[in-house]
């Protein structure tokens, strides 16, 4: 029994040591998390588990569109049941939930413009981009047509259309998507950011910006989220805005954060690595296991 216990503690220490090493390496910049694939082998760029990542994106995008378009559909039919603020909160919360649920699997992009931006700035392999786009548009389309069925006889399923001049809506979409991508790059690609709060940060950015963008452009920030309900509702007014705006916004947001980002001195980076909640927890457990063996 004692031997088995010792073996168990030894295996536990080995596992924790490996996790600490991996996390430290990730935060030091040598290896980066799901969203970042620098120069790697074909097996890393085109992994055997790509299918699971694609399914994760389908599910995450489905739920994103189902919640956001569902809330918008009900608001459009009867604004006494769901308010404009309620729509924004629902959108921000579903983004937060999906990041925590699927971020460790696929990166929880849920947005073709985000995937494109990550690929352009070497945070995602180009070879996987078409698969992610297919997953995102598939999930969005499925959600839109499911909503069309369950919300019948509502004819317009959460479409986003300009409420005024098209250039107003375009400018709003660029600005709000810039904000979302700037925050996303900060928490997803920078080792100094508190990664555990990524979901809250990105979800809050989506919620805050959509509160004022909603009355002007609908606050889409996502080509898949706009195209799917447009097809289901047969409403294509200003559709180009919701492709061009998010693409410009995400690319500019990622570029600006990449430009202002800088690397700290090694000593400072070492201190920053120890601020990770997960790393501290692992190190505490490792120390406790070592104490038990003394």
UniProtKB/Swiss-Prot annotation:
InterPro entries: Aquaporin-like, Aquaporin_transptr, MIP, MIP_CS. This is Aquaporin NIP2-2. The chain crosses the membrane at residues 54-74, 88-108, 129-151, 169-189, 197-217, 235-255. Aquaporins contain two tandem repeats each containing three membrane-spanning domains and a pore-forming loop with the signature motif Asn-Pro-Ala (NPA). It is found in: Membrane. GO terms for molecular function: channel activity. A motif (NPA 1) lies at residues 111-113. It holds the Pfam family MIP. PROSITE patterns: MIP. A motif (NPA 2) lies at residues 222-224. GO terms for cellular component: membrane. The lineage of its organism: Eukaryota, Viridiplantae, Streptophyta, Embryophyta, Tracheophyta. PANTHER family: AQUAPORIN NIP2-1, AQUAPORIN NIP2-2. Belongs to the MIP/aquaporin (TC 1.A.8) family. NIP (TC 1.A.8.12) subfamily. It is a multi-pass membrane protein. Aquaporins facilitate the transport of water and small neutral solutes across cell membranes. Keywords: Membrane, Repeat, Transmembrane, Transmembrane helix, Transport. It comes from the Eukaryota. CDD domains: MIP (cd00333).
